[in-house]
Amino acid sequence: MRNWSEKMRLEGWLLDVRFREDQAMLWIKVGDQRVQMKDRFNMDFFVSPDNVTQEKLVYLFDEHDHIVKIDKSLRFLSIDSPEKSQVLRVSVDSITHYRNLVKLVSRYGEVFDTSLSPSQRYLADRSLIPLGKLVVDVNDQNIITGIESLPLGLEVEPPPFKVLCFDLSLENEMLDLVTYNEYMQEEYRFTGPEYETLLAFVEYLSEYDPDMLACMETDLKRLISLQTKHDLPLSGYFHRKSFHLDEGRVYLNLMSYRRMSLAGMVERIQYNREVPRIASDWAAGRAIESRQTYEARRKGYLLPRNGFYQPVMSLEELLRERDHGGLIFAPNVGLHENVAALDFESMFPQIILKHNISYENVRNGRETEGFLLDFTRDTLDRRLYFKHKRKELEGDPEKWFWCETRQQALKEILFCTYGYSGCWANKFGNMDTFMEINKAARINLVKAMNIARRKGFQTIYGNSDSLFLERKGATRTDFDVLSDEIYTKTELPITVENHFRFLVLLPQKSGKNFGAINRYYGVTYDNKLVCRGIELRRRNTCQFVAKTQEESIRAMLDQESRDDVLSKGIEDANKVIDRACREIKRGLVPIDALESKTILRRKPSKYKARLPHVAAAEALNINGLDVGKGNVIGYVYVDADHKNPFRRISPAGYQKNFDAKKYMRLVEEAGRSIMLPFLKKEEEARKTASLESFFNP
């Protein structure tokens, strides 16, 4: 820790906030150093007495050893309160005594703001943004005398944080540590006997001096355990569900880092308004809840218990006003030519902003701006900026990648904002809000369909916020003009997302003629393959099956006309499937191309069914490898029909052979998935051919 010899004003990046008694310990990156600074901070909560007067409550606890102060405060009792009310604010001397005091005081009334984490309470009260830039005034003892958050900029580059991304495996006292760069490409590998390898990695860690460690939680716990075992300097410790790393370093969840990269992780954590050691692995719902909590605290709203604000709908209301969900226009199953997919740009957050829809104003009028709008607008503006900025950066792959990961990180949040509005876990949410957003979405989608119909376009598929339209002879310009007109009349941005040369809308897997939702594939006029809901899109599909399906789709659709697709195209696709099956049967496919990968969502022992990846994880545990929640489990089928689930598969890297029949079935199923609209015609053709051969031998 560096001590400054005089009072100084410093600018840096906020890495973490930790607590010791009545002090917040801030770790800030200043230049190329991580500096620890102290700020006096007392935990607090609010109470509204219900069986004693406020004066009586103050009298009862005024002399309590661990209460610093009880004072009167004006707060909004809920987000729909028109005026502030007087409540009592209880300040506690130490984080250690906080929970016991909350429990004690709650006997005398309703307590509020108790669900906030200490770090988020501090961030909200100081209006700070984690991983954001700030200015601090400090004295010669590194005690903060003033602090201010700087506004978030629109820089494409991520902040100058050094990240060490690694994974760890240990088997028979042989340690393997691999580090990766931002693109998850291997950089260094430390392999060998446990102690020597660990020592080399610890020395590398000290020399590289990263600001952040990106790894699986189990790997970091194992690293700290090995450091303890061999009496080496510790990287930190795990306490109260988060890592407190040495020298102010920050933990990042590896799965989130792989998916979003540093730029996306920064964007997501800045939205969460919670420090990364706690929030780096949060799903969108948890992130939204955190941001709402932060904003409510900062704006003076009392924070209710989980689900406290949820109004209960009567049976009559439920039957009369039941939600019909988003509008789905059933797919017109089969092959289509010259189709444009028009997509409303962030439709649901746009509706929230346009119609001023928020939890508290759905039933009570919308004269003032709702609670949801401020931070939803900020998030949407940032997402659209980075989304559109990508087009300017297509010649710069690195900056394009940063833009893409930033906008994707925010897209997940915005997509879930409307769904989370009716979730039971949402402190402020209610079904009315969710239903109102859905209603507006349905109205606007129907309006867009009618505009298209009047212009001669036919809707062949519609799903909540997108329309698939075709019109014989229509050009890309025609579709662009249509989207502009829809934008003008609905006041919701809409663009041509894809212009398909050929598009196949798939039926349900039962083989019936009912169209399946979000199951299609097609090729655009610029030869881009777009697909949804098929094996190629699934993360647990092995590389060989996915590659075969992609090749067969391209073979089918790489034709001059619709008639060619229905004849030569289908024939060429079947040839690709047949060739792949022959390669499997002859043992020509590398085993690593048949490896499936699935993420463990919980400990293997917590699964009720012994699914293939669960059986593989348990087998690894039996063999001395510690795998758990969050680990990516690779496996290969070796005897898929065996009664014993442990004999059906083998963990990746442990098998010599594979079940050829199983993989041939998987390839055939992948082929059948894309051929479903054409199978009936093929069967009729085969019947006709067999009859002709019978009568004309």
Predicted regions, residues:
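Helical catalytic core of nucleic-acid polymerases
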Residues: 333-447, 453-455, 470
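A structural signal for short, well-ordered beta-strand segments and their strand-loop junctions
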Residues: 89, 165, 212-217, 250-253, ...
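Metal-dependent phosphoesterase core characteristic of DEDDh/y 3'-5' exonuclease domains
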Residues: 182, 210-282, 413
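A general structural signal for short secondary-structure junctions and capping/turn motifs
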Residues: 80, 154-156, 204-206, 241-250, ...
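A residue-level signal for conserved active-site and pocket-lining positions in enzyme catalytic cores
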Residues: 167, 253, 383, 414, ...
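Short beta-strand-to-loop capping motifs
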Residues: 90-94, 217, 468-473
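DnaQ-like (DEDDh/DEDDy) 3′-5′ exonuclease domain used for proofreading
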Residues: 2-209, 228-235, 265, 270-325, ...
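DNA-dependent DNA polymerase catalytic subunits
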Residues: 3-7, 19-30, 275-355, 406, ...
